[in-house]
Amino acid sequence: MSKHITGHTGLLCLLGSPVAHSVSPEMHNEACDQLGLDYSYLAFDVPEDKMPQAVEGLRTMGARGWNITMPGKNIMCKLADKVSPASEISGACNTIVNDNGVLTAYTTDGVGFMRAVAENGVDIIGKKMTLLGAGGAATAILVQAALDGVAEINVFNVRDNFFARAEEIVAKLNERTECKVTLHDFSDPEVLRASIADSAILVNGTSVGMAPKTENTIITDTTMFHKDLFVFDVIYNPQETRLLREAKEAGCKTGNGMYMLLYQGAASFKLWTGEDMPVEIIKEKYFSGK
């Protein structure tokens, strides 16, 4: 890819650590080239304790915006001047828009999830979800699904550090949305079975089953699956986890996190540029072989 950079070229970037593996620079630079937009997207390896300095530098230099990956998603919310409703509830963000020095924090991971589900031909608005996990990806999904109109969400997590934080987020969602959200201890399989039985969608928001530990699965009892259930795994390496493989064998429709990644990027791109990312081109060029 060749790009002619001038004194007018705007800056977009990714902050976090590590970032060298990220497909975001390729996605966003390709999108800008396709649409004739004069931006360049770079990746900067920035540890959490250096985020404040990095943000002030980007603000001062007039960068149009940036994405944030781990470990900076929580601290970035505190560094922003304004936060979106989803970011305020979750306490995390993955996108910053810089409007003349005023920084607004957004989270587009949940937006990417909702679009990926719709892309699979599944409508979960007004229906019930069972969500496994309460970390960053799961929280983004939880918040956006509740804001967008999913009727009921049962969240299952072990009693770790995320559990107490999840209790606070669940309380906010029950207060501010029409969605009924309940947090459960993952240790009770019968409660989980009952939740899945009348859910339209089961989401694995954890890293269980990710490469290289591909034979691990978060659902060990496959009798919990039913043919009306859509099973979504945020993992995209491998494309088909053991969870998805066994769900498919049980007659479930399935989807992975590959297009969630694409569509969260498209949502960030729209916030910065006001333009729709040419997702079909990006999908074909960077995601067809994943």
Region annotations inferred by a language model:
Residues 3-120:
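Phosphate/diphosphate ligand-binding glycine-rich loop within oxidoreductases
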Residues 11, 40, 128, 151-154, ...:
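Residues at the starts of beta-strands that form the adenosine-phosphate
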Residues 18, 158-162, 237:
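Residues in the short beta-alpha loop(s) of Rossmann-like NAD(P)-binding domains
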Residues 148-177:
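NAD(P)-binding Rossmann-fold cofactor-contacting core
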Residues 228-230, 234-290:
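Adenosine-phosphate binding glycine-rich loop
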Residues 179-254:
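Rossmann-like adenosine-cofactor binding region
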Residues 122-128, 225-227:
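Short helix-loop-beta connector
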Residues 16, 105-107, 126-147, 157:
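Glycine-rich adenosine-cofactor-binding loop
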